[in-house]
Amino acid sequence: MPTVKIIGPYRFFFYSGDRDEPPHIHVERDNHIAKYWLQPVRLQNSGRFKRKELNRILKLIEENQTEFLEGWDEYFSE
């Protein structure tokens, strides 16, 4: 499960088996893992994060969307 980036307490990653789905990113903090689609950026699964934190994560993903998409393309184009 390749880690694309770590920002503060959040680890942004995808699973190697995610190839057959549209581009997305998982974000983990402690025992919570949420999933966001990347095109357009939107929440797919909240992973039991609270709404306020999900909004904060959404902004981080929007700010790093290009990097996350490049990481996705790079990994899954192999």
Language-model-detected regions and their locations in the chain:
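A short, structured beta-strand/loop element
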Residues: 15-51
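C-terminal structural segments of small proteins and small subunits
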Residues: 51-78
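Short leucine-rich amphipathic alpha-helices used at interfaces
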Residues: 5, 31-32, 75
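Short, charged/polar N-terminal "headpieces" of proteins
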Residues: 1-21
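Compositionally biased, intrinsically disordered low-complexity segments enriched
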Residues: 7, 26-28, 66-67
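Generic preference for hydrophobic/aromatic residues in regular secondary structure cores
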Residues: 4, 43-45, 64
